[in-house]
């Protein structure tokens, strides 16, 4: 068993408790749990600093450390618990390399803060304070009330996007991606792990049996339906490569042509993941897509059953809910994730187009050579409405580290 253990981070404050429940569950199923930890970092803390250069690299460090410990100790199976942007794909990459019976447990989302706030409310508050729209006292009040407890960022940002992607992929138990970090549902999720991993060991079901090309296609469609993060492209490509699945950036464009956006979730929408969980989570959405013929139903999952079998008894969303639109009247008929190619990105770039931007945009290019140059221009009110901001030399090599 491996967990991301980090006392300094609100996001992972509850991981130790969940890890204890998982270990107890394993120990009561004729197995022996051995707990070890690896690193994690918070993009929310690192954002806007040189520390962000370490973020993407941490994904590989996490994958390497899991592979190293499990490989050296010859463990029969692995249960990984994670809940931040980079440690979830890091876990899946590590599990894929090891290719022994494995399950991923999502640490869970944070509850909404005061006035329906979340982490991005704090970031926007800093911008409002910088532009003299709110006072310092108002900013401090936002900071004190936006994050009421442990859990990952509550919107459909990278963490919840990857949690949903992993559930759709079949590598976590049904319902794991939407549960609150401190909920009874999350505790039950952890208590069910022992029986689940025992079943995988008995049947010798490995990540390579689950993480197939068709499963990745399911994952992409679910991400699109939820209005998920562009970072999913980056991480799914790496995860697929690990298990020998051919997945290209162009596949997101092709699959996206027939994949509707259905979820009104932040940052482009209104609602947060705990509110989606209250009406059923991600499973009813997957059943909607399956009934429209948009998912590959025969894919194997960590339950030992196929996707179709998992979804058989899932109930539909309540009739009057406003979070998930029906497939017949989507928020957007095709994907919000667009793959662009041109002289700025000859090998491709990913854009998130929600439909609110119109069909085209023309503006004056403002080119900067670093994040710091860009921030200086913003803080000094040198960016005007209609400008197109281009930040060069911030990729994986040039940054280095691909700072966000």
Listing of model-derived features with the role each one plays in the protein:
Residues 1-11:
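Single conserved hydrophobic/aromatic residue that forms the stacking wall/gate
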Residues 4, 28, 68-73, 210-214, ...:
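Glycine-rich phosphate/diphosphate-binding loops that line cofactor/substrate pockets in enzymes
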Residues 12-16, 44-51, 88-96, 106-108, ...:
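Short acidic, glycine/serine/threonine-rich loops at helix termini
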Residues 14-57, 231-234, 251, 339-340, ...:
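Anionic-ligand anchoring segments at beta-strand to alpha-helix junctions in alpha/beta enzyme folds, i.e.
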Residues 18-21, 101, 248-404:
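Feature captures the catalytic cores and cofactor-binding loops of soluble hydro-lyases/lyases
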Residues 29-38, 136-142, 176-180, 201-216, ...:
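Flexible, glycine/charged-enriched surface loops at secondary-structure junctions
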Residues 47-53, 225-228, 242, 277-279, ...:
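Short glycine/threonine-rich loop-to-helix capping motif typified by GTGT followed
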Residues 52-218, 222-223, 228:
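Active-site cavity-forming subdomains of large catalytic enzyme subunits
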């Amino acid at each position: 068993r491996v967990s991301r253990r980090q006392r300094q981070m609100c996001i992972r404050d509850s991981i130790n408790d969940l890890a204890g429940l998982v270990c107890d569950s394993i120990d009561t199923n004729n197995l022996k749990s051995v707990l070890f930890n690896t690193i994690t970092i918070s993009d929310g803390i690192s954002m806007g600093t040189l520390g962000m250069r370490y973020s993407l690299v941490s994904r590989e460090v996490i994958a390497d450390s899991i592979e190293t410990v499990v490989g050296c100790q010859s463990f029969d199976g692995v249960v990984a618990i994670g809940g931040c942007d980079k440690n979830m794909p890091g876990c899946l990459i590590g599990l894929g390399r090891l290719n022994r019976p494995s399950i991923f447990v999502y640490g869970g989302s944070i509850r909404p803060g005061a006035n329906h706030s979340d982490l991005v409310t704090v970031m926007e508050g800093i911008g409002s304070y910088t532009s003299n729209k709110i006072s310092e006292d108002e900013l401090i009040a936002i900071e004190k009330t936006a994050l009421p407890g442990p859990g990952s960022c509550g919107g459909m940002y990278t963490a919840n996007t990857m949690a949903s992607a992993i559930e759709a992929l079949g590598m976590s138990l049904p319902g794991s991606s939407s549960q609150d970090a401190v909920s009874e549902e999350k505790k039950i999720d952890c208590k069910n792990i022992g029986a689940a991993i025992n079943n995988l060991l008995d049947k010798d079901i490995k990540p390579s049996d689950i993480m197939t090309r068709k499963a990745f296609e399911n994952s992409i469609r679910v991400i699109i339906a939820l209005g998920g993060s562009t970072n999913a492209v980056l991480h799914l490509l790496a995860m697929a490569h690990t298990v020998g699945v051919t997945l290209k950036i162009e596949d997101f464009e092709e699959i996206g042509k027939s994949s509707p956006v259905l979820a009104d979730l932040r940052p482009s929408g209104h609602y947060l993941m705990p509110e989606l969980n209250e009406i059923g989570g991600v499973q009813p959405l997957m059943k909607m897509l399956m009934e429209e013929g948009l998912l590959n139903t025969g894919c194997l999952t960590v339950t030992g059953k196929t996707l179709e079998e998992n979804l058989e008894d899932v109930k539909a969303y309540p009739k009057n809910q406003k979070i998930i639109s029906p497939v017949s009247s989507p928020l957007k008929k095709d994907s919000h994730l667009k793959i662009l190619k041109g002289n700025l990105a000859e090998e491709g770039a990913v854009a998130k187009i929600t439909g609110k931007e119109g069909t085209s945009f023309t503006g004056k290019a403002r080119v900067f050579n670093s994040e710091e140059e860009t921030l200086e221009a913003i803080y000094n009110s040198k960016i005007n409405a209609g400008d197109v901001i281009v930040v060069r030399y911030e990729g994986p090599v040039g940054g280095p580290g691909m700072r966000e």
